Amino acid sequence: MSWRKGIYKLPFRLNFDRFEDVYPQLKNQRFYGFKELSMAPGVNDESLIREKISGDIFNRAGIASSQTAFYKVYINFGSGLWYCGVYTMVEVVDDTMIENRFGEDDGNIYKPESDFTSFVPDKFEKKNNKTEADFSDVVSLINTLHSPLRTENPAQWREQLEAVFYVDHFMKWLAI
């Protein structure tokens, strides 16, 4: 979008483990504890602070959220530094971030493109544990959401839902 507007300010990612398969000596390479960072140009946010403020609010409320910070970005294309503007650095949700927030990284991280009416594997892209074809956590959530117990026995349905989904955490997130 910014490129079409004639603005030389594009989003980009920094992945510090990108070449660990090719160069094993780079395995688990981190930059100040981060495995991957996303640099957002904020072209749709004239204030440039929405993402930073929302992340801070979530973190202060005890809801796991990506760390954010502001950076002035300069790039050297060989003829000196080119000022690209102020970017919002956003911690990418990955196994490192999950382990830092929850003390473990055993669960799956998904980037869903689903409406959760049914389970379609192509609609749930795994961001970790990609070699394991275990989607039982998502299947269990979808089955619970659509269980007839929802109307027949709401108390039992709620109990089953809370066993597979952090309802209180979600409600807190929704409120903010």
Regions found by a protein language model. Give the residues of each.
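Phosphate/dinucleotide-binding and metal-coordinating scaffold of catalytic cores
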Residues: 1-176
